[in-house]
């Protein structure tokens, strides 16, 4: 439907993204990705409301789950439309949207959420949604910062080294690994929260608080020098992350009651790590083959 809206006189016209209502506000790649961002933030909020709500917790977490599904859908729409838009700019410019941090962070967000939603269905619990969506929201925060500071949403031609069909295999395989590792890390954090639910000594909880803040800063590792180029933004980001993690620790007893058993948490972690290692191994092999073809 989105691609059809670009058609004018039998040919695609990129300028229609600014004039056609459906494209401008909903289905152009940039609009769809902004909707994805908002929906992931809302999903995170509803999952946590469901965690602490007494009477309507199930309803709140269900809304969080539905919002996450819609966000994944908007991310896929944004990705596919962006791919089409790149060809509208020029046949020689068109490429799969996995060539810069803006594009791969969109992929990271929806892949991480999609894997979590799969496990949510498999194990019949939504209690982990708040934890996993925190790292997705952290990635969305980085994505929005990168969009504003670097105008990364603009489609750029590929550098010669990236003009290879290997990129279509290597990058997605890598980010399946990143997504499942991030999922496993947040489930592990939930495991520790459940394990330390009855702990009252602050010096025992401080390392757990620090770990939670570090996990929120995971997106920075993808961009060298990110902290130096947006100091004010990252200070606010740090403050919000620190408060959120502190709030989780303060409510750890309530959270521990809602979390699934240690056996289920272990199982989700192990399966996520297994998937991550498998795809990371594939990505490493593909990367080596790509490098051999590109540089010999």
Language-model features: locations:
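Hydrophobic cores of alpha-helical transmembrane segments in multi-pass integral membrane proteins
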Residues: 1-19, 26-155, 162, 169-256, ...
């Amino acid at each position: 439907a989105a691609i059809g809206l670009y058609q004018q006189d039998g040919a695609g016209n990129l300028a229609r993204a600014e004039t056609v209502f459906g494209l401008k506000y909903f289905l152009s790649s940039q609009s769809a990705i902004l909707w994805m961002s908002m929906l992931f933030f809302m999903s995170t909020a509803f999952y946590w409301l469901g965690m602490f709500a007494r009477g309507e917790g199930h309803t709140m977490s269900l809304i969080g789950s539905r919002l996450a599904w819609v966000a994944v859908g908007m991310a896929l729409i944004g990705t596919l439309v962006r791919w089409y838009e790149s060809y509208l700019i020029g046949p020689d410019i068109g490429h799969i949207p996995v060539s810069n941090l803006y594009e791969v962070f969109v992929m990271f967000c929806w892949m991480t959420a999609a894997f979590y939603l799969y496990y949510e269905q498999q194990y019949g619990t939504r209690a982990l949604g708040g934890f996993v969506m925190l790292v997705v929201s952290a990635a969305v925060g980085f994505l929005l910062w990168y969009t504003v500071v670097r105008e990364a949403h603009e489609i750029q031609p590929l550098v010669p080294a990236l003009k290879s069909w290997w990129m279509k295999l290597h990058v997605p395989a890598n980010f399946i690994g990143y997504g499942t590792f991030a999922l496993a890390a947040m489930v592990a954090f939930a495991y520790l929260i459940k394990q330390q639910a009855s702990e009252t000594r602050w010096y025992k909880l401080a390392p757990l608080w620090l770990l939670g803040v570090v996990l929120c800063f995971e997106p920075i590792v993808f961009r060298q020098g990110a902290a130096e180029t947006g100091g004010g933004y990252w200070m606010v980001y740090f403050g919000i992350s620190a408060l959120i993690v502190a709030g989780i620790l303060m409510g750890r007893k309530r959270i521990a009651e809602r979390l699934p058993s240690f056996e289920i948490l272990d199982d989700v972690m192990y399966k996520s790590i297994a998937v991550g290692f498998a795809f990371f191994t594939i990505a490493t092999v593909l990367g080596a083959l790509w490098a051999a073809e590109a540089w010999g």
